Amino acid sequence: MRPQQAPVSGKVFIQRDYSSGTRCQFQTKFPAELENRVDRQQFEETVRTLNNLYAEAEKLGGQSYLEGCLACLTAYTIFLCMETHYEKVLKKVSKYIQEQNEKIYAPQGLLLTDPIERGLRVIEITIYEDRGVSSGR
């Protein structure tokens, strides 16, 4: 059964981690609500990978500098014909989340929501009811 067909049992929100400043990174603390649903190491690896991808997106380098210069020279019309480094990495993040949902989370009755859909404030994990276990409600 696909999780989208089961009723929603709850949601877990993984908050941003501001301990290293305002760069986009999320807490790797394992939420108790996911106990017996997903392996702690897999969860932490998923969040660490997301944190690394967001760090890559925000990294300043030659490409970012060149994009900025081209943007100024073309009154930002260059972005009509090319993607920025940041946009490319955000696509990588979306693809990674989709893969993780298919391989790890969906079979466990969970669904990761792309943080960009929540304004990069939280990672939302939807928990679907397990039809095999009676909920007592």
UniProtKB/Swiss-Prot annotation:
Keywords: Golgi apparatus, Lipoprotein, Membrane, Palmitate. A lipid is attached at C69, C72 (S-palmitoyl cysteine). It is found in: Golgi apparatus membrane. It is a lipid-anchor. The keyword Membrane applies. GO terms for cellular component: Golgi membrane; Golgi stack; palmitoyltransferase complex. Its main location: Golgi. InterPro entries: Golgin_A_7/ERF4, Ras_palmitoyltransferase. The keyword Lipoprotein applies. Signal peptide: none annotated. GO terms for biological process: Golgi to plasma membrane protein transport; Golgi to plasma membrane transport; peptidyl-L-cysteine S-palmitoylation; protein stabilization; protein targeting to membrane. May be involved in protein transport from Golgi to cell surface. The ZDHHC9-GOLGA7 complex is a palmitoyltransferase specific for HRAS and NRAS. Belongs to the ERF4 family. Interacts with GOLGA3. Interacts with ZDHHC9. This is Golgin subfamily A member 7. The lineage of its organism: Eukaryota, Metazoa, Chordata, Craniata, Vertebrata.
